[in-house]
Regions:
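Nucleotide-state-sensitive switch-loop elements of NTP-binding domains
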Residues: 2-8, 13, 17-135
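Conserved C-terminal guanine-recognition region of P-loop GTPase G domains, centered on the G4
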Residues: 83, 98-184
Length: 273
């Protein structure tokens, strides 16, 4: 059976950065992996950030966003069925930062998916300097994503003080209490600078598994509490952007019958760096 891992992380926690490192370890081991970007947004920015992982041992897939929850679940199920035929050793699922984790477990229990996949690990990434003043809805999302995790990985721990890390863990446990979950985190917390991770650290994460846990559900309507905003190439001035655009339009290769074939090349050439 194909191992399947769920990597959750509250908004801005750094889970995409973690997945790049986690996936690279698997690739270096020789595993054949698939990464499924499972996002509600109409634009999947995280998939663009993972593009450099693509190769013989790693393929990226995504679920088209911009649909309701039921449609999203059907697309998730369909994509897993297709990926189950690709011969992967492991599939890594990266959901949005406001994901209902029950979707993952419910779909994995469906036939024929339950005969093809075995749940490996649920890992939750939490910012070591977690904002203390979160709304009830944000605390719920934080707790619901962490409740079933085999391991909580703190991001940016090298930038946090011991007091900030202590406060983050306390906040996480308070969020668990708010959703009437009996679980409290201590030994499951992984605190280490990601740049210093060794093979043994990744192997520990690969063996963390997951924890079946119950908590009180909160119904949150789509768009009720969070909206997606995209800020890209903010280091460019208006004049620099205009100059780059003019160069693209002046490029003769971008016109004519060969336009379709050269479009990708021209986009690379005019990329704002």
């Amino acid at each position: 059976m194909v191992k399947i891992d769920l990597i959750t992380g509250f908004l801005g926690s750094g889970k995409t950065t973690f997945i790049k490192k986690y996936a690279k370890h698997l690739i270096d081991k020789g595993d054949n992996i698939g990464i499924l970007e499972n996002d509600y947004g109409a634009v999947n920015v995280d998939m663009m950030l993972l593009k450099d992982l693509e190769g013989e041992k790693c393929e990226l897939e995504m679920i088209a966003g911009g649909c309701d929850a039921d449609c999203h679940r059907r697309r998730f199920r369909t994509k897993l069925i297709a990926m189950g035929m690709c011969g992967y050793d492991r599939v890594i699922v990266e959901p949005s930062g406001i994901y209902d984790v029950d979707e993952f477990f419910d779909v994995l229990r469906d036939d024929p998916i339950d005969r093809w996949y075995e749940i490996g690990n649920v890992i939750t990434v939490v910012d070591a300097k977690l904002e203390s003043d979160l709304s009830d809805e944000a605390d719920y999302l934080l707790a619901s994503e962490a409740a079933n995790a085999g391991c909580i990985v703190l991001s940016r721990s090298q930038e946090a003080t011991a007091e900030e890390i202590k406060n983050t863990i306390e906040h996480l446990n308070q969020a668990m209490e708010k959703v009437q979950c009996n679980r409290r985190f201590r030994d499951e917390i992984f605190v280490k600078d990601w740049e210093t991770f060794e093979s043994a650290d990744y192997e520990k994460l690969l063996a963390c598994g997951y924890v079946p846990e119950n908590y009180r559900k909160m119904h949150i309507e789509e768009g009720e509490t969070f909206k997606s905003l995209y800020f890209m190439n903010l280091d460019k001035t208006k004049n620099e952007i205009i100059e780059t655009a003019e160069k693209i339009f002046a490029d003769k290769d971008a016109a004519g019958a060969d336009h379709g074939r050269t479009e990708s090349r021209n986009c690379d050439r005019g990329k704002l760096k």
